[in-house]
Each structure stands twice: as C-alpha cells, then as structure tokens.
Regions:
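Short, well-ordered alpha-helical microsegments
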Residues: 101-105, 126, 162, 180-181
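Short hydrophobic signal-anchor/transmembrane segments that target glycosyltransferases
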Residues: 105-117
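Short, polar loop motifs at secondary-structure junctions
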Residues: 5-7, 122-125, 177-179
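Short, aromatic/basic amphipathic alpha-helical patches
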Residues: 12-22, 108-110, 129-143, 205
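Catalytic donor nucleotide-activated moiety binding site of glycosyltransferases and closely related
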Residues: 114-155
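A donor-sugar binding/catalytic signature common to diverse glycosyltransferases
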Residues: 156-205
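A nucleotide-sugar donor-handling region in carbohydrate enzymes
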Residues: 7-104
Length: 209
C-alpha cells in the first residue's frame, strides 16, 4: 500500500483505495493501493486498538490513578496537584509541540493561572528552557515555578505512557497527525499544532478540519 497522511481535505475521499501500478523498479508489474486515513466512511478511517476506550474510562474513573502515574513518570513521589483558595484543582496541561513563536507569550500569560504544564523532551523542552533563561533543557523531573505557573520537565515515554499522559491532563497541546488522533481518543480538550509547510499548504489542511 501507499500509506498517506491524515487529512480532512476533499481529495482524501476521491483518492482512497485508488490503484497505483508499479511501472519500474523491483515492484514492476505489481499494483499498490493508496490508503488515506480520514474521518468518513469513504476513507481509511482512524486507527484505534481494541479496548482503548474502555481502558481510558477505567483509568480516568479510578481514584488516585492519575496521581500514581504522574509520580512514576515524573520520578517524584512528592508531586501533588495544587488547589486554589476555593479548593478547585489546578489545570494540568501537556505540552508536546513544534517550535512556536507564540509560546513565550502564552507562558507569560499563564503565570497568572494556577496551572502545571508537563513539558515533553525535544522542541517543547528547549523552547521552555529558553523562556526560563536556561542554556539547555533541564533534567527530567526538574520543576520550576513562575508566578502561579509550574513547569515540570518529563522524560521520554513510549506510546502507552504517552496515552496515559493524554488521559491525565485537562488540556493537551499536541503536534502532528498521529498525536492528534491519540488526543481525540483521550476525550480531553486539545489544541493541535500543524507542521508548517512551504507556501502555507498546512493552512488548507487546517481549514478542512
């Protein structure tokens, strides 16, 4: 098959399952087929393993499951979610994104909010470290506070644990098509950051959604 990128654009329905005859190379004489993931019955749909929703609901409904997982992932058993003067819990946010010019302004504005941001390695950790005035990304488990904002730097995680992070947070800021789908299955509010393409082609993809 020719596995293509996820999109909600109109061409996906037209192109899904079309043949792609191989005219040259080792596969000459064979036929590949275009497979387009998508959001309608005329596309390849979205991947979701059996039992995922049930596992998510069980995790989100189990008292103490989120805190126990966060203790393990952050590597600090003293980590606790904070509450405001009205006993309302803080907002827990996952940050997994590309380089984003608006990030410093968002972090600065978040200093006035009772909020903990879990910062993933890579683009996000480097950008947040720069905002903090650090020369490099801190070690996993490092915590910084600026006003009411708390920043916690995470270690790398594998896919099952990434799902648990998505399930744990009140808001997920994610990048790329695969993570957008996992954020959908998490059933939590999320913001999707597209990869910026030449000639602003990513805006057409965004408009289609």
């Amino acid at each position: 098959i020719n596995l293509e990128y996820l999109s909600a654009e109109a061409y996906v329905e037209r192109s899904h399952a079309l043949p792609s005859p191989q005219m040259i190379g080792p596969g000459q004489g064979l036929t590949k087929w275009f497979f387009y993931p998508g959001f309608t019955v005329a596309t390849g749909g979205l991947l979701r393993e059996q039992g995922l929703v049930e596992d998510r609901d069980r995790f989100q409904g189990e008292a103490g499951a989120r805190e126990a997982f966060l203790h393990q992932r952050i590597g600090r058993t003293d980590f606790q979610l904070r509450r405001d003067s009205g006993a309302q819990p803080e907002t827990l946010v996952l940050l997994f994104g590309y380089a984003q010019p608006a990030l410093p302004a968002w972090l600065s504005a978040s200093m006035a909010c009772l909020q903990t941001v879990l910062v993933t390695p890579g683009y996000s950790s480097r950008e947040v470290a720069r905002w903090l005035g650090l020369a490099a990304s801190p070690t996993p488990g490092s915590t910084f506070e600026r006003g009411l904002l708390r920043l916690v730097f995470l270690p790398p995680v594998e896919q099952p644990e990434f799902d648990l992070l998505l399930w744990s947070c009140d808001l997920n800021l994610v990048r790329g098509e695969d993570s957008a789908v996992r954020a959908l299955w998490a059933g939590r509010p999320f913001v999707w950051q597209l990869y910026v393409q030449d000639e602003a082609w990513h805006l057409a993809k965004l408009e289609a959604f």
